[in-house]
Amino acid sequence: MVDGKATRQKLITWDPAKTEPPPAPVDGEWEVCYVAVQDFHTMSLVFDWLNTGRHPFRSVVIDSLTEVQKRCKDQVAGLATLSDREWGDLLIKMEHLVRYYRDLVFHPQHPIECVTFLALTEEKKGIMKPAIQGALSISLPGYVDLEGYLFVEETADGPVRKLLITPFTSANPPHTQYQAKDRTHVLTVKYGSFVSNPDIEEMLKIKEEGETNG
């Protein structure tokens, strides 16, 4: 719902600085609500609306956390190089953002079913991980139930989208490691290390059933 590119689904736009959230769709008139994030303050505005519970949304996708951090840097230091104190401010703001959005799934009146953070990927010391600067790159995995690495695998039947959900090291040199984790363990039991053509609604259903059955 926040930033990212338009999808093939029915799309509407929303400016949280000007209006309240759109009414619930009637007869499938819209499926995705898109918010253009041009400054970090917009992220706070969206959260404030979501936290009221007075909205029609079931899920939130932030695309991408890498870009949101850049917007946060713009707010903290503009075009200047970040000082040590400003790096600290950046970490606090970004950690608050991640945790506050994540906690929307526990909202007492209108819990969000799923909050998804997308990010670009970069290699750090031989490990492929989210392209997030500073200490947040270390703490981020601890804030979420699932950290995955999404890629496309070419097969005889054509390209297949796959989501890695457990740590993995490539067999060929330079033996790159891929950072991933499934804190629920339920998804790993169902899919193994890779989810082919991942469907978030299906994965949520499996997670909920696994947690219910213990």
Predicted regions: what they are:
Residues 191-214:
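Glycine- and charge-rich intrinsically disordered segments
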Residues 59-139:
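P-loop NTPase motor core
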Residues 113-189, 194:
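Phosphate-binding/switch region of NTP-binding enzymes
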Residues 49, 67-71, 143, 147-150:
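Conserved, well-folded catalytic cores of nucleic-acid-processing
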Residues 1-61, 66-67:
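Conserved P-loop
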Residues 2, 60-62, 101, 147, ...:
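Generic structural hydrophobic/aromatic packing signal, biased to beta-strands
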Residues 36-39, 83, 193:
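Intrinsic-disorder-associated interaction segments
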